[in-house]
A protein has these predicted regions:
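N-terminal small/polar-rich segments of proteins
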Residues: 26-84, 129-144, 148-264, 301-334
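Outer membrane beta-barrel transmembrane domains
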Residues: 269-293, 302-303
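Bacterial N-terminal signal peptides that target proteins for export
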Residues: 2-13
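N-terminal signal peptide c-region/cleavage motif recognized by signal peptidases
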Residues: 21-24
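Short proline/glycine- and polar residue-rich coil/turn motifs
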Residues: 115-124, 217, 294-301
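A surface-exposed loop-and-adjacent beta-strand signature within N-terminal beta-sandwich domains
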Residues: 81-123, 279
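Surface patches in mature domains of proteins
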Residues: 87-102, 252-276
Length: 334
C-alpha cells in the first residue's frame, strides 16, 4: 500500500510540472513601441463637470501565468516626452489635461517613479488616466496632444519564483542581483503613444409642459404662448425639430388623445406668434433665427424659442368632454 502511494505522488508531481511549463509558454511582458489612445467627452458636460478619469493604455502589458512566493515585482517608469496641452487642428483651440499613472498620481515630464511592490505584477495592460478640468469651453472636434507620450519602462516581474530564484519577465539589462549586490535597472524599454481627445457636440434643453386649461367647449381654449431654452456647444449652429406627437391625424396633423377613449383633439405649434408651423425638415427652427440670442453659440448663452400652441380642430365643439394629452419630442440637429 505504501509503495503505491509513493508512485502516485511522484506521478502527480511530474504532471504538475508539465502543466506549469505549458502555461509559462504563453506568459510575457511587453512594451508597445507605438500606439494610439483616444477618449471622448461631450462638450457641455466637459465645461460643467470636467472628465474625472478616462483610462488609456500606458504601453506596458503583462499577460499569462504567474506564480511567485516572497518575491518583489520591480517596476519603474520615467517620462521622457509628454504634453498636457491638446490642440484642435481645425480651430487652433486648446484643451488642458492632467495625466495620471495607475496609482492615480499625477505624472510630469522628466519624472521617474518607482512602483515596485510585493505583488504578482501587472495583469493585462497597465492603465494610465486622463483627467480634464471643468470650465473648458471649446468647439467639438478632435484635440491631439502637442507631443507624444514617451515612457521608459524598467521592470522585473516574477513568472515562477521563490525568494528570488526562478523565472522573471524583465526589461533589457535588468539585473536583480543577490542580497542587494549587483542590482541594476538596466537600459529599460521605450513606449511611445499618441493621445487624442474627441469633444462631442452637446446641448442642454429646457422645456415646460403646455396646459390649455379647462373650457366648456374646446373652441374656447385660448392659444398658449410658451418658450423653450436651448444652449449647445461652442461655435456650433444647430436646428431644432419637433415631431408630430404620439397620435398624428391625416399625416402630420398633431392631435391630443382622450385619456378615456379613442377620440382626438387637433392642435398645432407655431413659431413665435405667427402661423409658421414648427415641425421637422423644412419646418425646423434654426438657431440663427432664435427668438432671443439668435446665433450666439458660445456654449454658455441660451437661445430662447417662443412658440404658440393652438387648437385647430374645425369640429372642436363636437369633441367629447375629457382630458386630452400628447407628447412631442424635441430633436436638436447639427
Amino acid at each position: 500500500m505504501n509503495i503505491k502511494t509513493k508512485k502516485l505522488l511522484r506521478h502527480l508531481c511530474m504532471f504538475s510540472g508539465l502543466m506549469l511549463t505549458g502555461n509559462m509558454a504563453h506568459a510575457a511582458c511587453s512594451v508597445s513601441a507605438s500606439g494610439t489612445s483616444s477618449i471622448s467627452v461631450p462638450s457641455i458636460y466637459l465645461m460643467e463637470n470636467g472628465e474625472n478619469s478616462s483610462q488609456f493604455n500606458s504601453g506596458l502589458s503583462c499577460t499569462g501565468f504567474s506564480l511567485a512566493l516572497a518575491n518583489m515585482t520591480y517596476l519603474k517608469y520615467r517620462v521622457e516626452q509628454m504634453s498636457n496641452s491638446f490642440t484642435n487642428a481645425q480651430t487652433g483651440e486648446k484643451l488642458n489635461a492632467i495625466i495620471l499613472d495607475s496609482n492615480n498620481e499625477i505624472i510630469s515630464l522628466g519624472q521617474e517613479k518607482d512602483m515596485s511592490s510585493f505583488t504578482r505584477g501587472p495583469d493585462g495592460n497597465l492603465p494610465f488616466y486622463i483627467r480634464l478640468p471643468a470650465g473648458q469651453s471649446v468647439s467639438p472636434g478632435v484635440y491631439q496632444a502637442d507631443s507624444p507620450l514617451k515612457v521608459k519602462w524598467f521592470y522585473s516581474v516574477p513568472a515562477v519564483a521563490i525568494v528570488g530564484i526562478g523565472v522573471f519577465f524583465e526589461s533589457p539589462g535588468f539585473r536583480r542581483g543577490a542580497l542587494g549586490i549587483g542590482f541594476n535597472w538596466g537600459s529599460g524599454a521605450d513606449s511611445l503613444g499618441s493621445l487624442s481627445i474627441t469633444v462631442l457636440p452637446d446641448c442642454r434643453i429646457l422645456a415646460q409642459d403646455v396646459n390649455f386649461g379647462t373650457a366648456a367647449f374646446a373652441s374656447k381654449l385660448e392659444p398658449v404662448q410658451s418658450s423653450m431654452g436651448i444652449r449647445c456647444s461652442v461655435n456650433t449652429p444647430y436646428y431644432v425639430s419637433l415631431n408630430n406627437g404620439l397620435s398624428p391625424q391625416n399625416g402630420n396633423q398633431r392631435a391630443m388623445k382622450s385619456q378615456t377613449g379613442n377620440t382626438f383633439l387637433k392642435y398645432d405649434i407655431f413659431k413665435n406668434s405667427s402661423n409658421d408651423r414648427w415641425g421637422s425638415g423644412n419646418e425646423r427652427w434654426s438657431s440663427l433665427n432664435a427668438t432671443i440670442n439668435p446665433g450666439v453659440h458660445n456654449g454658455v448663452t441660451q437661445q430662447n424659442y417662443v412658440f404658440t400652441t393652438k387648437i385647430v380642430d374645425e369640429n372642436a365643439d363636437t369633441v367629447p368632454a375629457g382630458t386630452y394629452q400628447d407628447t412631442v419630442t424635441v430633436q436638436v440637429e447639427f
